[in-house]
Amino acid sequence: LLVFALVNRPYILDLMPHKSVVQHFIKAGFDVFMVDWGTPTDADRHRTLEHYIERYMHNIVNHICDYTERDQISLLGYCMGGTMSAMYASFHQELIRNFILLAAPVDWFVRSSVLATWFAEKWFDVDKMIDVFGNAPPQWLQGSFAMLKPMSNYVEKYYGFYDKMTDEKFVEEFFAMETWVNDNIPVAGETFRQFVKDCFQRNLLVQGKMRLGTKRIDLKSITCPLLNLTASGDHLVPFGQSSPFNDLVGSTDRKSITFPAGHIGLSVGSKAQKELWPAVCQWLAERSN
């Protein structure tokens, strides 16, 4: 089961036939399922993290187990989807056979994280924003991510396109990426409020103090085989934000791979497609029936 973040659509994991994490798993013989969280409306503004994890994810996992006639699934979570998957796995370890994290943050007090600095309580009043807008606006989210690398996203990218605009393959890939990058969706207001407060501003997850409803999230409860994939050039989720996962879980079979790529290149980059994902599929196959 592939679980993506709430801020973008999940098809980045199946962007094009030759840039597809999904295709790698299918070719390796796995049944692949991917969560589409849909597009929150004003009616969803009160949806909490508990709704997404303990209701939606739990229903999805149970459905897959029923459909495949298996007692467990393997779980892959990307970015915020990885953090949410870790929360789920801590509550329902009995349903998770293997766990793969892909550029998933866990420690938000890392000094190299520009986004975490912007979201710090000193600078960002998340209550005021959600009280006014209801949900986190997609235009605001997209602009925030783009401004992490303004020259690259607003200038250099288009110079690069101009230089290669006669290259049909490059143009096709460029517009596929642009379509996805600009296909942002709102984040349900109460979910965004809790994630910003508990993770970005209080850093409760890494301290073992975060709760969903009445249940405390204990990452030590995760005991299945764990593969933690990080990107050395990730400007959105810096290495230091995601690398602590391996020391926080209770798994004895745990491995980390740091790949020379950025946050998105870790999934769709040409080098990652050729080198990383075949290795990931092999790791998973060795731990699956």
Regions found by a protein language model. Give the residues of each.
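Short, surface-exposed "cap/lid" segments of acyl-processing enzymes
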Residues: 1-41
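Alpha/beta-hydrolase active-site loop
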Residues: 46-67
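Alpha/beta-hydrolase-fold enzymes
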Residues: 66, 70, 84-190
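Short alpha-helix in the alpha/beta-hydrolase fold that links the catalytic acid
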Residues: 224, 238-248
